[in-house]
From Swiss-Prot:
Protein name, per record: DegV domain-containing protein SPy_0865/M5005_Spy0672
Role: May bind long-chain fatty acids, such as palmitate, and may play a role in lipid transport or fatty acid metabolism.
Gene Ontology molecular function: lipid binding
Highest taxon, organism lineage: Bacteria
Repeat keyword on record: no
Amino acid sequence: MKLAVITDSTATLPTDLKQDKAIFSLDIPVIIDDETYFEGRNLSIDDFYQKMADSQNLPKTSQPSLSELDNLLGLLSSKGYTHVIGLFLAGGISGFWQNIQFLAEEHPEIEMAFPDSKITSAPLGSMVKNVLDWSRQGMTFQAILNKLQEQIDGTTAFIMVDDLNHLVKGGRLSNGSALLGNLLSIKPILRFDEEGKIVVYEKVRTEKKAMKRLVEILNDLIADGQYNVFIIHSKAQDKADYLKRLLQDSGYQYDIEEVHFGAVIATHLGEGAIAFGVTPRL
């Protein structure tokens, strides 16, 4: 079995995997004032925040190119790849996952699977890493898919944002529109639910209380198993440091990896968002 893993630019990959020849990534466009950008090509994350601050309109994103994925699958076939797993941004907040399922019929020479990751960022990158590791350990394709589904089912993220406008106006928050007029008195905690949608999980009165509540939620989640924990933020270093300190003060003794949301996810969360992601160690 020669396996390739395809993902998208919302996945935060471990440094040692960024040049791995078995990993392929599709760019997701970010549109600001009718100009199209691709992070890492013609847009740095610092430039993104500056352009977002300067613009009168909220940025938008589009889906990766279907034709690019179709062409990539043809290229992989010509290079002798026999199996492909595609792991992309949660189907609950992007239509891309639903739109690509037909491609398996277009490339019958490759055995492929596109499971819904139901997540993004560092937990998505962790899934990509695990799939490659399992493949190189000699696991069968079906065994990899079974184990991957176990990881997907055990993965989630909880988020606190400064401004719900990005999520609601972008159509990425399933049950948040009623909160827009009430943000002065609450600080909503959001989560990725079982369908990969971002939903309001709980309403807390202040940011400080919300941060403490995030720690309580995290400790409850990881009490019954072994998990990798990520603190993820969009230009909110002070909040990330504070959340990490609260975690350590609560007795958490394991490594905590800190990463930044890329431009695509920061488009929907806005500047100042803080989150934690958890994914099981398998």
